[in-house]
A protein has these predicted regions:
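Catalytic helix-loop patch of NAD(P)-dependent Rossmann-fold dehydrogenases
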Residues: 94-97, 101, 105-112, 116, ...
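N-terminal Rossmann-like NAD(P) cofactor-binding module of classical short-chain dehydrogenase/reductase
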Residues: 78-81, 123
């Protein structure tokens, strides 16, 4: 019998790619998603890509009783990969209570139900934002956790502490915290990608929409960074590679390969790429007839959500080669 994995936020950008990789690896997947930033059509596309249709339950993870019913319906769930969360940095500044409610309570509900239903482990979708403004580059897992730069980043920090405190209290739960950098790209089939409801929050959707004329120009925030071209440098990681990292992590928990009950891994490439370099690479790959119009904008307070240079000093090879 295939081992069952619950994926919250499984119709989202990273979640949908992870569901495909889980199914390709022989897992049976149950998706829980409220579709607040995605579409049920994604389930159809997952089936087209993998040849397997995952179980899907439209449900908000704030609904404790609803989650309890899902665990009861799909008995024997062995692990959880928890993506479901509100994730827009700017919006979190405007709506902090929404973010604290959505991002904290959803995790608490899962942790409360895991022992009851015999779930062995959880992979938590964390973020490089937990490092705040790092002192050294590249950023390793040993880097100190600094003051969060937004309510969104703070929810990631708090959730990590919630997991640690829960495990320390004697809970039988095992956990891996994946702190990843900047997911980018799409599935090679082009059936899955970053298709948010409403206004995009990341660079690539804006870039593609500008290239096909949906948007008149692409806004780049800042040209005065201490970088070769003046634009922000990020560590971009392909979303399929990121999805595979989640499969490796769940394998690690279920095969009891962990060295500690709570482990942390940075997931990135360890190489920096500037925003303008990425735009130029995009133009070359798709062979645009004319350059994508770019407007440089500046935000107040030096854009605290943008860390000028952030690269991962990854420990991921430790779990790839376990």
């Amino acid at each position: 019998m295939k081992e069952r994995i619950l994926v919250t936020g499984g119709t989202g950008y990273i979640g949908s790619h992870t569901v495909v990789e889980l199914q390709n690896s022989g897992y049976e997947v149950i998706i829980v998603d409220n579709l607040s930033n995605s579409s049920a059509d994604v389930v159809d596309n997952i089936e087209k890509v993998s040849g397997i249709r995952p179980a899907f339950e439209k449900l908000d993870c704030l609904d404790l009783d609803g989650l309890d019913a899902v665990f009861a319906k799909y008995k024997g769930i062995k692990g959880i990969i928890h993506f479901a969360a509100s994730k827009a940095v700017g919006e979190s500044v405007q709506k902090p209570l929404l973010y604290y409610r959505n991002n904290l309570v959803s995790l608490i509900n899962l942790l409360e139900l895991m022992p009851k239903h015999g779930v062995e482990g959880i992979i938590f979708s964390s973020s490089c934002t937990v490092y705040g403004q790092p002192d050294e580059l590249p950023v390793t897992e040993k880097a100190p956790i600094k003051k969060a730069e937004s309510p969104y980043g703070n929810t990631k920090q708090i959730n990590e502490e919630i997991i640690r405190d829960t495990v320390a209290s004697g809970s039988p739960i095992n956990a891996i915290l994946l702190r990843y950098f900047n997911p980018i790209g799409a599935h090679p089939s082009a059936l899955l990608g970053e298709l948010p409801n409403g206004v995009p929050q990341n660079l690539i959707p804006y870039l593609t929409q500008t290239a096909i004329g949906i948007r008149e120009q692409l806004s780049v925030f800042g040209d005065d960074y201490n970088t070769p071209d003046g634009s922000c440098i990020r560590d971009f990681i392909n979303v399929v590679d990121l999805a595979k990292a989640h499969v490796i992590a769940i394998d690690r928990i279920l095969n009891k390969k962990q060295k500690e009950s709570v482990e942390v891994f940075n997931i990135g490439t360890g190489r920096g790429l500037s925003v303008l370099e990425l735009i130029n690479a995009f133009e070359k790959v798709i062979k645009v007839e004319q350059r994508i119009p770019v407007r440089i904008e500046f935000a107040e307070n030096n854009k605290p959500e943008d860390m000028k240079r952030l690269r991962a000093g990854m420990n991921v090879e430790c779990i790839v080669n376990y």
